[in-house]
Amino acid sequence: MKLSRNTVRVLAVTLIAGSSLFITSCGKTKTTEATNAAAATTAAPIIKETEAPTEPVAEITGAPGSEKETEAAASSGKLKTSIQKYEVNSISVEYPVVSGMENTSQQDKLNEHLKENALSILKNYPDSKEPMDESQDTLEVKCTVISADSGRVTVTYEGYYNMKGAAHPNNLFYTNTVDVKTLKDLSLKDAADPYTMAAYALSEEVAFVTADPEAAKAVAEGLKAVQKDMTVEQYQECLEKADFPLKKGSDGKTVTWPASFSYESEGTLYYSVPVPHALGDYIIIEYDITTK
C-alpha cells in the first residue's frame, strides 16, 4: 500500500530557514542551566534491549518508501529483518537486525554496524562535546527498514529528543544506507552531486514531502520569511557533510551530527533539510534521479 503524502512544489527560496538556522542545526547549544541540571548524579541505569512491537506507532510518520518493507521481506533475494529496541530510563531507540545471510560472520558484523550507527545519536547529538544525558533526557526513535537485500540495507529513523530543562523537544530524522559486503556507509555523495542537489533545492522545480496539506502550506509560507539568508554554497556544504559516517567538526576533534540525511528508494533520492522548530525541525526533499 502506498504511503499517503502530498508532494508540494514551492519556490526554492522558501525551503531554507536561513544561514543562522543552518549553522545552529549542525550543533544545537545547550543552556548552562540545563547542562548543570543534567550533571546531577543518579543511580546506574538499567539497560534493556528487547524485540520492538511490530505495530507502527501512530505519531511517527513513515518515510517515503517504507510501505515496501513487508513486500521486500517476501521478495526473492531480499534479506529478512526485524526491529529491536535499546531502552534505558526515558531513552528508547529502535534498530534493525538482519537475518538469513549465508555468511553469518558478515551478518554479525553488519548487525553490529547498523546498531552502532543507530545508537550513535546518544553520544553525538548535537555533538560529542554535549552528548545526551541518558539519566535525565528523553529520546524516542522509531526505525523503518526501507529495503534490505544482498547489496545494501537502507534504514530511516524518526522521533524526537527532549533535553531536560529545554523549552521544547526537537523532532529528529536520520538515515543509514550500508553496503552489505564492504560495510561502507553510503552517503548522498554516492547517489548524486551535492552542488546539483543544492541548486535543485533552490530551483522552482524543487519538491518536498509532507503527509499534511495544511502543514505543507505553513512550511511554504513560513520559509518565505527567511528565504534571503541561504546560498547554494551553504547548502552544498551541508549536503557534502550529510549522512554516516559521522564527521569531525571545525576543531578537528569533536564529532558533529549531520544537518542533513539522505536515502534512495526506487529511483528517488530523499534528503532532509533543517527548518525552524515551528515548521517541524526538518523537511524532506525528493529528487527523481532516473529522469533528471
Each predicted region: which residue ranges?
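Hydrophobic/aromatic pocket-lining and membrane-interface residues
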Residues: 1, 50
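C-terminal motif of bacterial Sec signal peptides marking the signal peptidase cleavage site
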Residues: 22-25
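Repetitive helical segments and hydrophobic/amphipathic motifs
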Residues: 14-18
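Bacterial N-terminal signal peptides that target proteins for export
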Residues: 2-11
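Compositionally biased intrinsically disordered regions enriched in Thr/Gly
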Residues: 27-45, 52-292
